Amino acid sequence: MAAPDLSTNLQEEATCAICLDYFTDPVMTDCGHNFCRECIRRCWGQPEGPYACPECRELSPQRNLRPNRPLAKMAEMARRLHPPSPVPQGVCPAHREPLAAFCGDELRLLCAACERSGEHWAHRVRPLQDAAEDLKAKLEKSLEHLRKQMQDALLFQAQADETCVLWQKMVESQRQNVLGEFERLRRLLAEEEQQLLQRLEEEELEVLPRLREGAAHLGQQSAHLAELIAELEGRCQLPALGLLQDIKDALRRVQDVKLQPPEVVPMELRTVCRVPGLVETLRRFRGDVTLDPDTANPELILSEDRRSVQRGDLRQALPDSPERFDPGPCVLGQERFTSGRHYWEVEVGDRTSWALGVCRENVNRKEKGELSAGNGFWILVFLGSYYNSSERALAPLRDPPRRVGIFLDYEAGHLSFYSATDGSLLFIFPEIPFSGTLRPLFSPLSSSPTPMTICRPKGGSGDTLAPQ
């Protein structure tokens, strides 16, 4: 019988006198008794002492609780040897007594032992039936409120479902609008492309034969002149008799020579490359560009708002810094481009010369060299009625632009120039592998009362650009 007694003693020693269950985090009081930490904390609910031991009633002025780790191991061992039996419904799990009361402060069911423990002395403790009736009334009010909330939630859910369906319909409608509009635009652009190509071909068929006819006529005249020159050169080598024989006929043919110049054919193309709506699209990428006075040639005069520049007749006394262009009559924009798409417009008015474009930030600004792509410049130069660049020879313009749009796509290596007035393409550089930092470049080239003015973006997206 020794083994059962030992097992029973182990259970008794490992059981808390308050909750009558195995110890959980046991602590020891000053009087030497052990309790679960949570049990003694609840039992000593008052904030100030003295504190009475629940077992021997000895008073202690302070909460001196020492962890009892050996007892915790013993309780764990007892728990493994004799697991606590399941607590029947309606029975207190701590004291294994019937639940007969309800604490309104902690909202807990209590047994008689719970009430005697002193933990709930200052709480609102009521019999089960009375507490149940009061809580039932509260629950019914809560149910009424929750049912109203449920009705509102169902209404909101129905509205949300309708909104989702409506939104999907709106998105689908707009999707069809986008597809339809772009398909229409593609057809219009394709038709416009065919019309431009057809007009260009007609213009080629109209002018090219006249140019070839003039070239052929000049070839015939050149051949006739070559024969006559050869004949006269041979006659000059003859003795006197041979030289003078039939000289009258030879001199007559010389006098009859009249060089007929070719027909003057205008070299301006009547067909211009103008894509409907292109400039409006490019303006989505417009930026607010201003001039950098530290880079301006001493002969250039900048406006106070740094948007206009013109060339003066006298040099200004300005610091000769490495950033300043000299002798080239150039000035850079403040903006620096290392990626992305950018568009800006410049009002040139009736100026007879100007240069616009971009350059690398590290270009040589002190040498009077060619502003070519090889030197880090990509610019369009306008001279009277012609424009050129380092990539293309002089080309005539039928209608010189009064406002020029510049579009840069850094990653695509694209730089193009447009007449911002009618949207016609002025020039496009071949694909450029840009690297490093690029900056806008402006040059008036010559003196003129008309300044070059950077247009200021107006309003929000989709608005036009206006000069200052």
Swiss-Prot record:
EC id: 2.3.2.27
Zinc finger (RING-type): 16-57
Binding of Zn(2+), residues: 92, 95, 114, 120
Function: E3 ubiquitin-protein ligase that promotes the degradation of insoluble ubiquitinated proteins, including insoluble PAX6, poly-Gln repeat expanded HTT and poly-Ala repeat expanded ARX. Mediates PAX6 ubiquitination leading to proteasomal degradation, thereby modulating cortical neurogenesis. May also inhibit PAX6 transcriptional activity, possibly in part by preventing the binding of PAX6 to its consensus sequences. May contribute to the regulation of the intracellular level of HN (humanin) or HN-containing proteins through the proteasomal degradation pathway.
Protein name as annotated: E3 ubiquitin-protein ligase TRIM11
Tissue: Ubiquitous.
GO terms, biological process: host-mediated suppression of symbiont invasion; innate immune response; negative regulation of AIM2 inflammasome complex assembly; negative regulation of DNA-templated transcription; negative regulation of neurogenesis; negative regulation of viral transcription; positive regulation of viral entry into host cell; protein autoubiquitination
UniProt comment concerning the protein's domains: The coiled-coil domain and the B30.2 domain are both necessary for interaction with HN and PAX6. They are also involved in MED15-binding.
Reactions catalysed, as given in the entry: S-ubiquitinyl-[E2 ubiquitin-conjugating enzyme]-L-cysteine + [acceptor protein]-L-lysine = [E2 ubiquitin-conjugating enzyme]-L-cysteine + N(6)-ubiquitinyl-[acceptor protein]-L-lysine
GO MF: protein domain specific binding; protein-macromolecule adaptor activity; ubiquitin protein ligase activity; ubiquitin-protein transferase activity; zinc ion binding
Involved pathway(s): Protein modification; protein ubiquitination
InterPro entries, A to Z: B30.2/SPRY, B30.2/SPRY_sf, Butyrophylin_SPRY, ConA-like_dom_sf, PRY, SPRY_dom, TRIM/RBCC, Znf_B-box
Gene encoding the protein: TRIM11
Modified residues annotated as Phosphoserine in this record: 85
